[in-house]
């Protein structure tokens, strides 16, 4: 798709009747949005076809003019998709570029298309349609990522690994349980996407500049034709509203934060020091100087894109925060933020799904690490509560002394002699050793939502029925 970016001071704008001279070259440059809003060409044409069809149905334009308009718009769609359309900066935006070309193709009938319509409701329509499609893509990509995690969780429902708090070993869990935590996160993201689709499912076309129109239009007809549930209810709010864009960016930002947390774990876990996973060659790169390197660049780039997405959200919030009703030109700056965030989110979700499916899980390294850091200390305290009748706070104190002794001796809890344990508390018996293995610890966590393999499988089954 070619673009004419020449500076000009000629006045051939479609709003130029009130002006005696054309805009300055720098005004054209700052005012033009065609460099980015040409991305909305398909939505703009789709909306114009629906609008023209409604105008003819209502007797506002003739059927003959409607047919010319629809034919011309379809020709323009083909030209753009074939890369044969020249976009002009002096025509400002996608709406006026298409309308100008339509006038070239069909003559005066093109001038009837904008009857009962403003660029204010036109751009609101185009942008809503585009965001709706992007939300549907995000829903599909999140579903794919959830499916990848469900498969890994099922495969590793019994694979023991260390669970962490403060990035310090806390308690043994299973890798399947850890995977299911991300299923919950991304499941919430997907639910937010679905709610956002419901929220924006109202057609803005017909609100005109801000006050509605005196023509006998049928907004319900265009809403139905464009796949919306209903038209918006207040014309001032309709052209002022960018909540749908802010909601998209909010969802993208939350999803990106989840992706970033996951990416951080992938980066850490793939280091030789952890060695919990091995990334496939397909999602790694090498070094230009160090032949041995295998870098987790895909995960790092996913982590970095979170900054871009969060920045887009803050940018649009700041753009919108002081705008009086209804439309202001500031709102032209909304699209680049959403376009960039949508592209970043799509890349990040697809890359992460590939990494999760392709990575090798090193169960032996996970299990070896699971017992480090006295990870079964809580099991020892729970045993003292159950078997010796100690209040939990007393059991916590006794266990702390046992941990200190093991640390002093440089051994695991299970390696301490019984006499050393009994010297700390006489109620301790040899039965204590039965709860000090990581396998026993994991198996005991049978509470709803816990890490015991059977509980993990219940979680997987629940999600299988909803994915």
Swiss-Prot record:
- Keyword Disulfide bond in the entry? The reply is no
Q: Which domain of life is it from?
A: Bacteria
Gene3D superfamilies in alphabetical order: Fumarase/aspartase (C-terminal domain), Fumarase/aspartase (Central domain), Fumarase/aspartase (N-terminal domain)
Write down the EC number: 4.3.2.1
Under HAMAP family, the record lists:
Arg_succ_lyase (MF_00006)
What family classification does the UniProt entry report for this protein?
Belongs to the lyase 1 family. Argininosuccinate lyase subfamily.
Protein name in UniProt:
Argininosuccinate lyase
Originating organism: Allorhizobium ampelinum (strain ATCC BAA-846 / DSM 112012 / S4) (Agrobacterium vitis (strain S4))
């Amino acid at each position: 798709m070619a673009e004419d970016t020449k500076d000009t001071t000629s006045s051939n704008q479609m709003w130029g009747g009130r002006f005696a001279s054309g805009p300055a070259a720098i005004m054209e440059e700052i005012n033009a949005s065609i460099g980015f809003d040409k991305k909305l060409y398909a939505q703009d044409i789709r909306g114009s076809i629906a609008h023209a069809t409604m105008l003819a149905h209502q007797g506002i334009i003739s059927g003959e003019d409607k047919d010319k308009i629809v034919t011309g718009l379809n020709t323009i769609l083909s030209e753009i998709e074939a890369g044969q359309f020249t976009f002009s900066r002096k025509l400002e935006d996608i709406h006026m570029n298409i309308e100008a070309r339509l006038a070239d193709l069909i003559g005066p009938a093109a001038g009837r298309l904008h009857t009962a319509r403003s660029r204010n409701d036109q751009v609101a329509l185009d942008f809503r349609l585009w965001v709706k499609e992007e939300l549907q893509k995000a829903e599909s990509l999140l579903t794919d990522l959830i499916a990848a995690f469900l498969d890994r969780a099922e495969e590793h429902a019994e694979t023991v690994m260390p669970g962490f708090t403060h990035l310090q070993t806390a308690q043994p869990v299973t890798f399947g349980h850890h995977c299911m935590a991300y299923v919950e996160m991304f499941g919430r993201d997907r639910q937010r996407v679905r709610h956002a689709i419901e929220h924006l499912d109202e057609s803005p076309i017909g609100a005109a500049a801000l006050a509605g129109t005196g023509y006998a239009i049928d907004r319900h007809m265009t809403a139905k034709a464009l796949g919306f549930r209903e038209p918006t209810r207040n014309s001032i709010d309709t052209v002022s509203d960018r909540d749908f864009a802010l909601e998209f960016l909010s969802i993208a930002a939350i999803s990106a934060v989840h992706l970033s947390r996951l990416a951080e774990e992938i980066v850490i876990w793939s280091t030789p020091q952890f060695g919990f996973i091995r990334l496939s060659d397909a999602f790694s790169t090498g070094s230009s100087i160090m032949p041995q390197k295998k870098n987790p660049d895909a995960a790092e780039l996913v982590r970095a894109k979170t900054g871009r997405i969060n920045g887009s959200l803050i940018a649009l919030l700041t753009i919108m925060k002081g705008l009086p009703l209804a439309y202001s030109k500031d709102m032209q700056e909304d699209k680049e933020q959403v376009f960039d965030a949508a592209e970043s989110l799509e890349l990040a979700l697809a890359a992460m799904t590939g990494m999760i499916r392709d990575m090798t899980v090193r169960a032996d390294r996970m299990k070896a690490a699971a017992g480090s850091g006295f990870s079964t200390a809580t099991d020892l305290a729970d045993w003292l509560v159950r078997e010796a009748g100690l209040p939990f706070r007393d059991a916590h104190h006794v266990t702390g002394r046992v941990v200190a002794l093991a640390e002093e001796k440089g051994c695991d809890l299970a390696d301490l002699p019984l006499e050393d344990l009994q010297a700390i508390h006489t109620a301790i018996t040899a039965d204590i050793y039965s709860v000090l293995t990581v396998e026993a610890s994991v198996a005991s966590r049978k509470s709803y939502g816990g890490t015991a393999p059977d509980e993990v499988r219940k979680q997987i089954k629940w999600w299988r029925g909803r994915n």
